[in-house]
Amino acid sequence: MRLSHFFTYYRTLGGVQSVLKRHHAADVKRGHEPAFLFAFESDDFAEPNFTGLGFGGAHSISSMRARFANHSSRFTDSVAICHNMWGLQFLADLMPAKRRVGLLHSDWTGLRPFLETQRGLLDGVLCVSNALVELVSSCLPDLTKSNRVKLIPYPVDGLTAMPERAPLAGRTVVIGWVGRMQTEQKRVERLPGLAKALESAGIDFRFELLGDGPRQAWLEQQLPSDRTVFHGRKSADEYWAVLRRWDFITSVSDYEGLPISMLEAFSAGVLPICPAIGSGGDEYSAELGDEFVWEAFDFGQAASKLKSILAKPESTIGQARAEARALTNRHSEVEYFRTFDQFVARIADEPRVSAERLAKRPFYFSDRLPFGLMTRLWPNGCTRRNE
């Protein structure tokens, strides 16, 4: 089957990118003919089936459409896999695919109205968490009626064995965090507040941070230097060498889909200290017990819950680690691709439900504005449809 993957970025570090790399490595082996198109990447890929459109903040929707139209033929007779469905509102009519399937990896502020603008543009949606399945189902009821919204297990390469750990009693507790050090979504400026709450509760802890970003220098000034280790960006064995030493993993994000880093940590027996933000991470953490989820963003409650966990017998904590590890069993690459292939094949075989011919795009003054400016001043202008 011809597959046309479409997303914004490929070269950055993130969960969507890790999944796209798996598709690049495995789609052909599974009998597909894949192509990859990236909106904001430059067109200098070594891979012959990769194309970058070179979009930037100065581009307008009008200029984006003109450039995208030059690559419309890539979608002919294919199933378009629209990762996070970016740009479909103003590009779908230039995408002559047999079917359009959304693969929703993420949650974000304004996701509900964004999804509502996708009505009639998609033939099915795969979601990485039950929370996203519920949201998509409520926003796109026509897809729900015909069972075209489905959960897909995010693939992770976990550790093959649980690392050995010294008992928590009488030693420093290691709390990890993974991500890009930025305000948008990750809200890393909250980490110092969490650290202060843990100190006030008398918890002997050490923060270990994996990642980098624009707020790193600020964090280095604000977090206690004697309790914080900045590891920078790591990958492969270096990444696992850090993560396997952690006792807990936390987050202070405004929103998440299902964090791959949390699943990877679970595979190493790392336990969550998870804020309740309505993500897939909340759901998995709650399966281990209410004490692993704290009200966002009540840092005092987070410290109190961690203190109650630390007071438990080591055998109870060990059992929780084993249960966390067991939660990742369903997240194999084999299961991910089995679900993906079966769903896409079914959608391709069943009648089309997305609009095959969309209305000609009318004149919108906003289509002439710089996209980067519009995302800040008038985000709704970025999702106007051809109607």
List the predicted regions and their residue ranges.
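A charged, aromatic-enriched C-terminal amphipathic alpha-helix characteristic of glycosyltransferases
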Residues: 162-163, 314-369
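Short hydrophobic beta-strand element within catalytic cores of glycosyltransferases
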Residues: 271-275
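Nucleotide-activated donor-binding/catalytic signature segment of Leloir-type glycosyltransferases, i.e.
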Residues: 218-234
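Conserved donor-binding/catalytic core segment of Leloir-type glycosyltransferases
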Residues: 4, 167-186, 192-195
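A short, active-site helix/loop in glycosyltransferases that binds the activated sugar's phosphate group
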Residues: 112, 123-148, 156-158
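Aromatic "clamp/platform" in nucleotide-sugar-dependent glycosyltransferases that forms part
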Residues: 254
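Conserved acidic donor-binding segment of nucleotide-sugar-dependent glycosyltransferases
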Residues: 291-300, 308-314
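Short His-centered aromatic/hydrophobic patch
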Residues: 81-87, 104-107
